[in-house]
Every structure is written in C-alpha cells, then in structure tokens.
C-alpha cells in the first residue's frame, strides 16, 4: 500500500513540474505611432505563433481579434476607448494586459 502511495506521489509531482515548466509570456508596448505591438511565447522556449489575441473594451466587448504572427507578435491600432489585451495561450494560459499599463 505504501509503495503505491509513493508511486502516485511521484507521478503527481512529475505532472506538477511539467505543468509549471510551460508558462505563457506576453508583453505589449506602444509604438508611438498610434499602434500597439504585443510579443509572446512560453517559458519553455516555445513560440506563440498562431496564439489567439483579442482587444476588448472595458465592458468586455471584442474590438479587435487576431493571432500572433510567425514572429510571435501582434500589432494593432490603438483603440480610442479604454481597453485590455488578451493572450489566449490554451490550457489555462490566459494573460490580460490593461491598456493603461502599456508604455512606449
């Protein structure tokens, strides 16, 4: 019985380490020309190519939809209203960036 518990504990520990080894990374900056560029990837070195991106207003309405390019970036025209950017990396990897936090 104790051996089974040890095996199960080791399997769960390995699974937890595997899950933690793959965190999403996304950062956005203001280009100074009325556009915003976001760059993304994963902590294990994986690219963000094709990762869905959304720009939402403060009420949650989608203003812009797209995906990370083959360079793992996403550029859009800065909305005239308050907004947030959403990086949807799958498997619970969602990053939201408030437009007020985006700087040049």
Description of each model-found segment:
Residues 5-13:
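Sec-dependent N-terminal signal peptides
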Residues 19-37, 59, 98-103:
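Beta-strand-rich domain onsets/edges
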Residues 40-44:
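Short solvent-exposed capping/turn motifs at the termini of beta-strands
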Residues 49-51, 83:
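Short beta-strand/loop motifs in extracellular/secreted proteins, especially
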Residues 52-65:
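Short amphipathic beta-strand segments in non-cytosolic proteins
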Residues 67-76:
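Glycine-centered loop-to-beta-strand initiation motif
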Residues 81-93:
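Short, aromatic- and glycine-rich surface loops/edge beta-strands on solvent-exposed regions
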